[in-house]
Amino acid sequence: MNYSLEFFPPKDQESFKDFIDQARLLSIFSPEYMSITHTADTVDNNQTMEAVKILKKNLSVEIKPHMTCINYSKSEIMEMAQNYLSLGVDSIVALRGNTKQSVSNREPYYDNSLDFIKALNAGFDIRVSISGYPEAHPESRGVIADFIHLKEKSDAGVDEIITQWCFSNDLILRYRDLCYARDIKIPISPGILPISDIKKVKYFAKLCGSTIPVEIEKAFLNIEGNDDAAEDLGVQFAIQQIDDLLNEGIDNFHLYTLNRGDMTRKIIEHFEAPNRIKTVSSEMKAS
């Protein structure tokens, strides 16, 4: 079993210590990499890059930033990529992202992830991961169109598909089989989200077009108000989901940590002890 871990960058300096503590807690399990979601107002005010800097400085785990292209000019996004390479990053998650501004009267920009991926591979010696959607992208034009686009991105030079979190293994396995049927042979890492707050997960599921199986929702509603029981149940569901996918031949997983190392740690410990305990300084500075 191989796994990667996803974090989001802290919103302020006060949150950095806990962020670092959670990353350090999980680094002893030797994940394939830690990815950091994209949060940046401008090229110069990039919280993701600050998080990458501190983790690269203090951990011997591969750090993989997410990059979204639609809110930056072509020159800005290429500058950002170069800045990451200067930090020793050699792999990124390339995404289109959601627009935050009017697209009129702007410098030329990449309005889709395919062109962005092509530009990254043409300009840099870099490995690229992309997103996948077992339940279809919210802006899906249909299954055929989605997989034509995915095949184009695969052929443009991609090393991995990280899926949106999905609680249905049937949908994940169907997605894998559809990829293979269309000669998309790059590794697929299903996204696994341990649930602790069912109301928050329902809210985000609505935004991204994901579904929550009725039996899972009912199980959490039956213990509403008991946070400890909810966390235990979330861990149990995640373990069962991974177990079932392992039995179907899938052995790469992307764990959405939500910056909470405790639940993720319990899931990993179910499958393996730490592969290698690293020596990490206890005095990690957010600078």
Predicted regions and their residues:
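Active-site mouth loops of central-metabolism enzymes
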Residues: 2-18, 63-75, 129-145, 222-236
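Conserved, mostly hydrophobic/aromatic
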Residues: 6, 34, 84, 153, ...
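Active-site beta-loop-alpha junctions enriched in small/polar residues
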Residues: 7-10, 37-41, 66-72, 97-99, ...
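Short, acidic/polar
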Residues: 13-26, 48, 74-82, 141-152, ...
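Active-site pocket-lining/capping segments in soluble small-molecule metabolic enzymes
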Residues: 14, 108, 112-133, 183-235, ...
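Glycine-rich, positively charged N-terminal anion/phosphate-binding segment
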Residues: 16-24, 42-61
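Glycine-rich, proline-tolerant flexible connector loops at the mouths of alpha/beta enzymes
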Residues: 30-51, 97-108, 158-172, 257-261
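Glycine-rich anion/phosphate-binding loops
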Residues: 69-83, 107-111
